[in-house]
Structure formats: structure tokens, C-alpha cells
Curated annotation (Swiss-Prot):
Pfam families referenced in this protein's UniProt entry, alphabetically: Metallothio_2 (PF01439)
Keyword presence, Metal-binding: yes
InterPro entries assigned to the protein according to its UniProt record, in alphabetical order: Metalthion_15p (IPR000347)
Protein name: Metallothionein-like protein 1
Disulfide-bond pairs as recorded: none
Recorded family membership: Belongs to the metallothionein superfamily. Type 15 family.
Functional note: Possibly relevant to mugineic acid-family (MAS) phytosiderophore production in iron-deficient barley roots. May have a function at the regulatory region of MAS synthetic genes or Fe(3+)-MAS transporter gene by conjugating with Fe(2+) like FUR protein.
Organism: Hordeum vulgare (Barley)
Length: 74
């Protein structure tokens, strides 16, 4: 079965899966620390985090063997 994921769930350069939010992309073999500075109302930050987590859960893809999406659900 051929698996050709689209722009929001496709392996990009260096076998990094393309995500809707590339800044939230996990790097394999590296530790990433994210610092969030919120200016304004605290509830806006909570809403953004929920939206970002939902976006990641909806795609749920990562680069597998031979630079192919695993699982391919696009």
C-alpha cells in the first residue's frame, strides 16, 4: 500500500515530519526546552496550549523507517 502524506503530515528535509506547527516538532535524539512568555490574560495561553495539543493529536504522525510517516493517517 502506498503512503504519500500531504503537507501537514509529510516527511521533510532530514526526515523530519512536516507538522501544522513546525515549532512544536519533536527532534529525535535531542532534548528540547520550550520557554513560553505570556503577555496578557492567562486564559489565552491555556486556550493556545489546548489548540496546539489538539492539533498534534489530530495528526499523530512521526517519521518511521525509510523516512515514511508512521502511522500514515492522512
Amino acid at each position: 500500500m502506498s503512503c504519500s502524506c500531504g503537507s501537514s503530515c509529510g516527511c521533510g528535509s532530514n526526515c523530519n515530519c512536516g507538522k501544522m506547527y513546525p515549532d512544536l516538532e519533536e527532534k529525535s535524539g535531542a532534548t528540547m526546552q520550550v520557554t513560553v512568555i505570556v503577555l496578557g490574560v492567562g486564559s489565552a495561553k491555556v486556550q493556545f496550549e489546548e489548540a496546539a495539543e489538539f492539533g498534534e493529536a489530530a495528526h499523530g504522525c512521526s517519521c518511521g523507517a525509510n523516512c515514511k510517516c508512521n502511522p500514515c493517517n492522512c
